[in-house]
Curated annotation (Swiss-Prot):
Pfam families: UPRTase (PF14681). The lineage of its organism: Bacteria, Pseudomonadati, Spirochaetota, Spirochaetia, Spirochaetales. The keyword Nucleotide-binding applies. This is Putative uracil phosphoribosyltransferase. SUPFAM superfamilies: PRTase-like. Binds 1 Mg(2+) ion per subunit. The magnesium is bound as Mg-PRPP. The keyword GTP-binding applies. Coiled coil: none annotated. It comes from Treponema pallidum (strain Nichols).
Amino acid sequence: MEGQTARRVITEAKFLDDCLTERDSYYLSKLDELYSSAMSSFAQFEDQQNGARSARAEENIIATYDSIGNLMQEICKELPALKVYSFETQRENHAEVSRVVSKLRNIHTGYSEFIYYTQRAFEMLFRLAYGGSHEEHKTYLITKTPVAFPVQNYAVHKIANVDYKIENTVMCVMLRGALLPSMIVSKEIEEYSSHGYVTPFALFKIKRDDLRDERDMQYVFDLDKSYFSARELDGKDLVFADPMNATGGSLVTIVRYLQDLGVKPKSISCFHMISALKGAIRVVRSLENCTVYTLWMDPVLNARAYIMPGLGDAGDRVNGVDVEDYPRNIIQLLADYGSNISGLYRSQLRKIEETVLGSR
């Protein structure tokens, strides 16, 4: 780690960049050039008063994005630990993921709709990681239905048995934006498990210093406001579900700290709706036996370390905006999700409450 002060662990951007190879840096530079070309056309595209100018800009944007997509596909072939949904699935699935990500990005997508598409996104990511193949052993679901005449009816459904993949998992939550996505993935694990396995939760309070730029960014891990047991993480399959992976700094900071405590994860899986390529590469270069699953890969970061084109602040869009001097704690966040979400994720809420209350 870079440093530890007053129950805080701090990692600096340079620590993360040291893991990048020359080839990584070349690819990232090439993508910066391509995206700069696209940005040069954005203002012209906005100028709807000049139809011909706007049409030419649209053509350039589409052509540039095609080039960006082709280059990122080439990069991901060289890094098998990066799993991008549209690169890993059949072509008939690509329209669905494009529409889901487009709705998440859209500035006009309101809170309820954003939550709906967030749930869809992480369900898709779960299937990408754990959905099972035709070769895997099958198990049967025998379900009692509401039809009771002339006798009580039951339905039988055959599914892949993925218990061995999911029943050693612990959800690792980077507060606060990752709370709901982690509950969604935990719920999927419970539903796919033939034993109704409910994941334990480890809760980590970490933030980056937004007064800094991307090149000198610091990631501050607050141990006093985190809830976890290192002993209960050792030998486990650690799962991180966070809406966005911009720089990878928060995730690497947490895992490196756990490793310093002697934790040896069996595996690490990271689920994201959108990742920046730089952040995704940093994660898989820095951490052994780690796989990044992302619904969409974006090409670049801006100087403030935000993903471009991105979708804004995912934490604010999922949880609402906190008052700066009075940020909500985890219990307040859970309460603000309301009865519909609380009812759906009842088992997950119980585990989270046990983690928070049992750590003090």
